[in-house]
């Protein structure tokens, strides 16, 4: 029996799945029904629909009002070694394992279930737009990954990472052709884009 106040349910989402650079991040969030209403009234929705400043402002609210939350990540090397789906699932599993209590139900954004999760789960297409716990997870994962990429942009200048966060923009592709990949690029992704890399 799942708690009627929402506390037995965790929303989980990932960010950075399609990036050419850096890790894939995931977050898991447990919200009470009251916290979900409060956060939605404060503007919580899918992280992709929020401005960077609005997203950043929501992070301390989510952290303060969530019953529990956890972050996980899988490196570019794990993506290359295990494939993006497995690496994403590992990040999600890590985020779930960082929760203080095992959720009775996991709501997963998207269509693919977590093969590594042995408990109850439900996939929800566009769940980050319709379920507050998934939306909160998307915001925490996005902000955590973006903060890491900004720090890494100082270590790897010339790629414009601080502007595109590792996604395959024209600027990023041009920098890859000019400078070659860094150790934190996903080489398995680059082979699909550039036969010469």
Swiss-Prot record:
Keyword match Manganese: yes
Cofactor(s), by name: Mn(2+); Mg(2+)
GO cellular component: cytoplasm; ribonuclease H2 complex
Intracellular or extracellular location(s): Cytoplasm
SS bonds (residue pairs): none
Free-text comment on the cofactor: Manganese or magnesium. Binds 1 divalent metal ion per monomer in the absence of substrate. May bind a second metal ion after substrate binding.
Annotated PROSITE patterns: RNASE_H_2 (PS51975)
CDD domains on file: RNase_HII_bacteria_HII_like
Keyword Hydrolase: yes
UniProt entry keywords in alphabetical sequence: Cytoplasm, Endonuclease, Hydrolase, Manganese, Metal-binding, Nuclease
Enzyme Commission code: 3.1.26.4
Enzyme class: hydrolase
Domain RNase H type-2: 7-197
Main subcellular location of this protein, as a coarse class: cytoplasm
GO terms, biological process: DNA replication, removal of RNA primer; mismatch repair
The organism's place on the tree of life at top rank: Bacteria
Function summary: Endonuclease that specifically degrades the RNA of RNA-DNA hybrids.
Family to which this protein belongs: Belongs to the RNase HII family.
UniProt-listed HAMAP family: RNase_HII_B
NCBIfam families listed in its UniProt record: PRK00015.1-3, PRK13925.1
Protein name: Ribonuclease HII
């Amino acid at each position: 029996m799942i708690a009627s106040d929402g506390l037995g349910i965790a929303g989980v989402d990932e960010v950075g799945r399609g990036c050419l650079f850096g890790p894939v991040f995931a977050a898991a969030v447990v919200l009470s029904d009251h916290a979900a209403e409060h956060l939605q009234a404060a503007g919580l929705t899918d992280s992709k629909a929020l401005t960077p400043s609005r997203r950043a402002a929501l992070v301390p609210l989510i952290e303060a009002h969530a019953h529990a939350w956890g972050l996980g990540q899988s490196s570019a090397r794990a993506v290359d070694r295990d494939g993006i789906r497995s690496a994403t699932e590992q990040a999600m599993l890590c985020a779930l394992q960082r929760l203080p209590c095992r959720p009775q139900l996991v709501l997963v954004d998207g269509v693919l279930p977590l093969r590594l999760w042995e408990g109850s789960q439900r996939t929800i297409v566009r769940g980050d737009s319709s379920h507050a716990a998934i939306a909160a997870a998307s915001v925490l994962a996005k902000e955590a990954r973006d903060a890491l990429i900004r720090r890494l942009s100082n270590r790897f200048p010339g790629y414009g990472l601080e502007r595109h966060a590792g996604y395959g923009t024209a600027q990023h592709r041009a920098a890859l052709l000019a400078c070659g990949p860094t150790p934190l690029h996903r080489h398995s992704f680059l082979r699909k884009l550039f036969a010469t890399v």
